[in-house]
């Protein structure tokens, strides 16, 4: 069933492959033309400027990607071997996305009970988060439950005129429901905290900095996960950490691919698919698509909307994840100091560029040599300490 579902998805992509190739080819060439008309060598530099990356460039990101290959890919390979044992499989294919034989953890309670539990959690976390979440509940600033005709997805937006954030999602009875109440609430809390910044452009930071608040809130709320997951709490935490770490190589692969694409705007669709397969062998060496032809031939990236719609917006998630891991590590050592640093970061909004915000929060820059290695070593040690047979 897993294989048939995965194959059915990419059957649609295969049937429309020529249209996707043509569309992306036009986008790449148009973006290249815009960049060269403005005096840039190619779209890479312009793409960075459009993302507001005024304090780092492709060289720093390239170094970061290299660290992921050196220090994260081997750990993910080990986690996949462990997953194979957990599931009792002789071989893992890309469609073997389940994490536990018994299924993934599920939150206990109705949507109303989950929100009530979150309200209690945020009051216990801090005075500021308690006040913030009361406003979200009392002013009905969250549309959380799935219903017929509702658009998919989840996000946080804002109403600057009223100094209020807004959370949208589709609860579906999975652990993702709790992630909404932590991840999107992290975005919303940052906006609430920075609402008094003097400029509208300072209310939100750039994309990679914005994800620090959301991903870090996922970890700051860990002490309360038992009230949502009961006996499945350890399973939830393991999935959370392992999944966050395992995402890093894919995120880096998408970024590396986009750099190559815009540095080689005359490449053909076939060239791009071959390049994806080459990069996949570096960042995701354990992927096996079985006999599903479209992803096997290098087309899987066409299912990633960011690549079409928001060029260079993807490495942001990986940079923020390393910062969030640092907050998790700090909170395990000195929770009060970690929360103080996080609060200071949220209040700053977008008044500083990414590197300035990271330094303000007392974190190490993910680009810097040694940062990623030291962070993932602690994450790996935590994963190694878990008795996965008991999950």
Task: List the predicted regions and their residue ranges.
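Short, charge-rich amphipathic alpha-helices with coiled-coil/heptad character
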Residues: 1-6
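Contiguous, non-catalytic segments that form substrate-binding/exosite surfaces or channel walls
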Residues: 10-166, 364
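Post-HExxH zinc-binding segment in Zn-dependent metallohydrolases
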Residues: 69-71, 194, 205-233, 240-241, ...
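C-terminal, non-catalytic "cap/extension" segments appended to globular domains
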Residues: 145, 181, 189, 216-219, ...
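Extracellular zinc-dependent metalloprotease catalytic-domain scaffold
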Residues: 161, 171-172
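Short beta-alpha connecting loops at secondary-structure transitions
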Residues: 166-170, 197-207, 236-242, 261-262, ...
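Short alpha-helical catalytic segment bearing the HExxH-like zincin motif
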Residues: 176-184
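Catalytic Zn2+-binding segment of zinc metalloproteases
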Residues: 186-200, 220
């Amino acid at each position: 069933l897993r294989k048939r579902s995965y194959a059915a998805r990419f059957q649609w992509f295969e049937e429309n492959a020529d249209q996707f190739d043509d569309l992306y080819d036009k986008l790449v060439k148009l973006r290249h033309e815009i960049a060269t008309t403005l005096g840039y060598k190619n779209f890479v530099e312009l793409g960075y400027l459009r993302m507001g990356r005024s304090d780092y460039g492709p060289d720093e990101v390239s170094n970061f990607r290299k660290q992921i290959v050196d220090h994260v890919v081997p750990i993910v390979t080990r986690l996949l071997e462990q997953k194979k044992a957990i599931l009792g499989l002789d071989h893992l294919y890309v469609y073997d996305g389940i994490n536990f034989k018994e299924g993934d953890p599920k939150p206990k309670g109705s949507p109303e009970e989950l929100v009530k539990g979150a309200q209690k959690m945020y009051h216990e976390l801090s005075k500021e988060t308690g006040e913030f979440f009361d406003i979200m509940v009392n002013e009905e600033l969250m549309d959380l439950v799935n219903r017929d005709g509702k658009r998919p997805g989840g996000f946080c937006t804002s109403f600057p005129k009223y100094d209020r954030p807004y959370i949208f999602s589709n609860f579906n009875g999975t652990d993702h429901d709790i992630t909404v109440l932590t991840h999107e609430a992290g975005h919303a809390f940052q906006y609430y905290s920075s609402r008094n910044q003097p400029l509208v452009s300072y209310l939100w930071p750039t994309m990679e900095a914005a994800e620090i608040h959301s991903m870090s809130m996922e970890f700051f709320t860990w002490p309360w996960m038992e009230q949502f997951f009961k006996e499945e709490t350890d399973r939830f935490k393991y999935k959370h950490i392992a999944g966050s770490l395992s995402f890093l190589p894919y995120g880096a692969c998408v970024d590396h691919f986009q750099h190559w694409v815009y540095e080689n705007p005359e490449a053909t669709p076939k060239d791009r698919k071959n390049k994806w397969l080459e990069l996949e062998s570096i960042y995701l060496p354990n992927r096996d698509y079985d006999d599903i032809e479209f992803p096997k031939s290098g087309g899987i990236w066409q299912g990633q909307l960011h690549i079409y719609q928001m060029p260079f917006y993807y490495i942001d998630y990986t940079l923020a994840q390393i910062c969030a891991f640092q907050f998790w590590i700090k909170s395990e050592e000195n929770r009060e100091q970690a929360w103080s640093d996080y609060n200071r970061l949220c209040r700053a909004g977008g008044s500083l560029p990414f590197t300035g915000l990271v330094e303000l929060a007392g974190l190490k820059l993910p680009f810097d040599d040694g940062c990623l290695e030291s962070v993932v070593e602690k994450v790996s040690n935590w994963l190694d300490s878990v008795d996965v047979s008991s999950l």
